[in-house]
């Protein structure tokens, strides 16, 4: 940012629960948020990815600290303890329920595309 090589806001995606990486303890999540705050101040958007069985807990911890969340079968096959997810849509619905239970406003698909500066699948040439 200081050298002008990239423009704010940065998207900082922190990943939790990957073998050999940072764990899924609430202090791990708080540490990564504090580190991003120290490095980037208010010039970033924070999002988390919780791999495996901790996906929804990590999502809730992020939301409670003002962060965004990412869920999907590429990150976890589980919907909840002992229950395999049948689809990405099922995980998104579960995440929405968790976030709304925390009184967190959930972005619409169009709002999410704007936040992430994506053009949308109907405008991609693949």
Please tell me what each predicted stretch does.
Residues 1-73:
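Catalytic alpha/beta core domains of metabolic enzymes, predominantly
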């Amino acid at each position: 940012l200081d050298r002008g090589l990239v423009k704010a806001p940065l998207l900082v995606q922190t990943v939790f629960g990957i073998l050999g990486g940072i764990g899924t303890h609430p202090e791990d999540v708080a540490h990564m948020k504090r580190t991003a705050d120290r490095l980037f101040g208010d010039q970033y958007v924070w999002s988390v990815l919780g791999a495996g069985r901790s996906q929804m807990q990590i999502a809730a911890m992020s939301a409670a600290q003002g962060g965004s969340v990412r869920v999907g079968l590429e990150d976890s096959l589980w919907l909840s303890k002992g229950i395999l997810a049948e689809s990405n849509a099922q995980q998104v619905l579960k995440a929405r329920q968790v976030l709304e239970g925390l009184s967190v406003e959930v972005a619409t698909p169009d709002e999410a595309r704007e936040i992430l500066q994506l053009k949308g699948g109907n405008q991609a040439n693949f």
